[in-house]
């Protein structure tokens, strides 16, 4: 989805197959990856160890893991994602079950000259309309995935496996169990801006593919009017292409004023 300025960040538990977070972002900054990770640990606590891709966009996540769990204990394993079968399977499923629909819609819009990816107004409008729709689809699919029976685990769901595994191990003096059951939740109720400022974390300058950020070509008042006028989640008879057209038209009218 990079072509249209979108990227999905996500995490999956290797034992239970529970997806703790899938988040659609309009950039691939390290701060965006960190935001997704913080959202995950607020709900499921800080894991003992995680696997991360070699990409620089995950540097802030590695830093936070070392802050929360301590340095030099192997809290983060870095390497190519192809060595992580769980996450590779997850990305295949996410594309086939959720993203492929929008991939085809966007390609169709380009072929019909409805969408010009070199036009900032078109790109902002595309993201305005489709980011919340895709995020909602990801949320629904995540809930379905976490509630589906796993054939090789006696028909238990990822939710059940995660809960049962946590209860079975709750008495262990391990980092994961201490984080889950005995750590003050306020320690993980952290804000991304505070972390970036406290540890002086800056965006890496060696991210291989940098997604451009499309700012609203509107005044604050016009943008607020857009939010009040056009709901990106409203019903559509054309897979939201009609809503996209209305947003483009609205911006065009505003810019002529």
Which residues make up each language-model segment?
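Mixed-charge, low-complexity intrinsically disordered regions
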Residues: 153, 165-257
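Short clusters of hydrophobic/aromatic residues that line enzyme substrate/ligand-binding pockets
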Residues: 161
């Amino acid at each position: 989805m990079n072509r249209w300025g979108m990227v999905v960040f996500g995490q999956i538990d290797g034992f239970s197959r529970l997806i703790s977070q899938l988040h659609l972002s309009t950039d691939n900054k390290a701060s965006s990856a960190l935001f997704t990770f913080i959202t995950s640990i607020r709900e499921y606590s800080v894991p003992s160890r995680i696997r991360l891709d070699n990409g620089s966009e995950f540097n802030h996540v590695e830093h936070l893991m070392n802050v929360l769990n301590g340095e030099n204990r192997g809290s983060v394993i870095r390497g190519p994602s192809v060595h992580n079968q769980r996450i590779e399977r997850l990305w295949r499923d996410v594309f086939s079950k959720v993203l492929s629909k929008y991939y085809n819609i966007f390609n169709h819009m380009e072929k019909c000259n409805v969408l010009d990816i070199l036009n900032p107004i078109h790109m902002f409008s595309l993201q305005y309309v489709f980011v919340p729709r895709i995020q909602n689809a990801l949320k629904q699919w995540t809930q379905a995935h976490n509630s589906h029976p796993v054939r090789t685990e006696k028909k238990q769901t990822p939710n059940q496996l995660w809960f049962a595994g946590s209860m079975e191990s709750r008495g262990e003096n391990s980092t994961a169990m201490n984080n889950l059951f005995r750590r003050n939740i306020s320690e993980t109720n952290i804000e991304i801006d505070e972390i970036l400022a406290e540890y002086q974390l800056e965006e890496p300058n060696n991210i291989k593919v940098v997604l451009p950020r499309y700012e609203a070509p509107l005044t604050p008042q016009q943008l607020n009017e857009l939010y009040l006028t056009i709901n990106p989640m409203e019903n559509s008879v054309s897979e939201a292409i009609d809503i996209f057209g209305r947003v483009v038209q609205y911006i065009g009218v505003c810019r002529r004023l």
